[in-house]
Amino acid sequence: MTNLYEAYDVVVVGAGHAGCEAALACARLGFNTIMLTVSMDNIALMPCNPNIGGTSKGHLVREIDALGGEMGKNIDKTYIQSKMLNQSKGPAVHSLRAQADKMDYCREMRKVVENTDNLTLRQDEVIDILTENNEVTGVKVYSGGVYPCKVVILCTGVYLNARCIYGETSHYTGPNGLPSANHLTESLKKLGIEMYRFKTGTPARIDKRSIDFSKMEEQFGDEKVVPFSFINNPEDIEKEQISCWLTYTNENTHDIIRDNIHRSPLYSGNIKGTGPRYCPSIEDKVVKFPDKDRHQVFIEPEGNYTNEMYISGMSSSLPEDVQFKMYRSVSGLENAKIVRNAYAIEYDCINPMQLKSSLEFMSINGLFSGGQFNGSSGYEEAAAQGLMAGINAARKLSGKEPIVLDRSQAYIGVLIDDLVTKETHEPYRMMTSRAEYRLILRQDNADQRLTRIGHEIGLISEDRYEHLIDKERMIKEEMMRLENSLIGASKEVQEILEGLGTTTLKTGTTLAELVRRPELTYAALAPLDKNREPLPEEVITQVEINFKYDGYIKRQEHQVEQFKKLEGKKIPEDLDYSDVPSLRIEAKQKLNQIKPSSVGQASRISGVSPADISVLLVYLEQIRRKK
């Protein structure tokens, strides 16, 4: 007999980074939500790298925060080292990255989850998605019970039929020996959902007491910490930071790998899943880049109160005996004691082209999904999708239109658009190069781009919204003041400019023109700016960027206007592309499969040509005229 449990508005399956953001969003928007997980002890687990952020990923975390998500706040509480990457480059690619105390990160996120109204946490494995007439009605769990619900959000991570592999050893288990979920895939297949088999990997963990750090280069965090969350001030989160360390592989390391490559499951055929192109294992690096005589290896602490060190850059699935030799061949690791073996992990995920841009399945009403289940990789990509899936699930229950961020609004928009529009046969990783409008999608202005939307959704408080309005007012007023502040070509001014290493003046100018000079900073011009009032650092940053990159920003804004024209041409959901004359057969098939919401999205589909788009535009105009 089936045990009928309490009914919920929303069931979230999985309590990783995607699941937590999805569940918190739904609960905070007033919907009775339950989050089901195979292990309550591992909420927001970081099973691989011990960091949040990095190139493009830092952008995602700040966007999550700007919309009202939790990841940025949580890493600000639990970081052990913070660094702004790419500072020698332009602001478009500046990316914040923080080492996390993994255990603290889990604990703090669990505190938030357990203290959120409308949110219940329950340990159990979901084995079946229940539907009626292609509409979600509930989920069945391993214990035999059923949770009736209106919406389900699947955030299963790498746990579906997960198999961990190193050398000839393999076992069906999730990361770090956690239980895998071995029943849900069959339920999804019965619903007609197309599944993929992907693979990822992780390096060994080594006891820090066995490492000779004197042979390595110490890597410090930044003295001036930048928070991930816009609600935090730098001074509020400052703390003593822990160093990371840099070493390198060598020819001996590479010889050990080459001599044993036949024992790697990647090359023996024991691994069937497709791995991430941009996060290769060390054996992949050695095989694919034979001309490189060394590869970087970063030694990263996993927390304040553990001896485990993460060996970044050396993920592997080689046998245990080879791992010992390989790691011990690296300078500083000659006496390394492995406390956890490196391994690869295979798992089931979906073809994300079955999803709408709202992250709801096209074929099943009320079924949403987010995270690595959607074919992406990374904690940050997962959290971003989980947040958007949660927001749109809540809006569906409210009878509201979904929130779909486009490619000119956010990296989150680029991420989701790529997943649902472009075919991917490997784990998708976010990169700055994927964003066409990255100069206006900087991490420093995520709040100005997205906090209004978060406020309209209901995830941003009135106080936080007012803080944004005040910040924007200060930016505008300071820019106007600098534009109107005249500087004469006096002897004193010329001496100051000479001292700053910049060209002296021939005639008078404004402070704004001086700020525009690449070699000058706002701070350096203080001796020429007697009327300057103290301003928050975040305001000064915006003022400087707006002046220095004004021409480039305007050019990109013009490109966005052109982009918006095609995005604004909406396509009816029920359009059958088979009826569109003159469309090529491949285009008809791809368009019917993906069901793009706009002509802009249609133009980005692989196999749809510019000529097909012209045909489609003519057809849509004919439909419009008939109406």
UniProtKB/Swiss-Prot annotation:
Gene3D superfamilies: FAD/NAD(P)-binding domain, GidA associated domain, C-terminal subdomain, tRNA uridine 5-carboxymethylaminomethyl modification enzyme MnmG/GidA. Its cofactor is FAD. Keywords: Cytoplasm, FAD, Flavoprotein, NAD, tRNA processing. GO terms for biological process: tRNA methylation; tRNA wobble uridine modification. NAD(+) binds at residues 275-289. GO terms for molecular function: flavin adenine dinucleotide binding. It is found in: Cytoplasm. Homodimer. Heterotetramer of two MnmE and two MnmG subunits. NAD-binding protein involved in the addition of a carboxymethylaminomethyl (cmnm) group at the wobble position (U34) of certain tRNAs, forming tRNA-cmnm(5)s(2)U34. This is tRNA uridine 5-carboxymethylaminomethyl modification enzyme MnmG. The lineage of its organism: Bacteria, Bacillati, Bacillota, Clostridia, Lachnospirales.
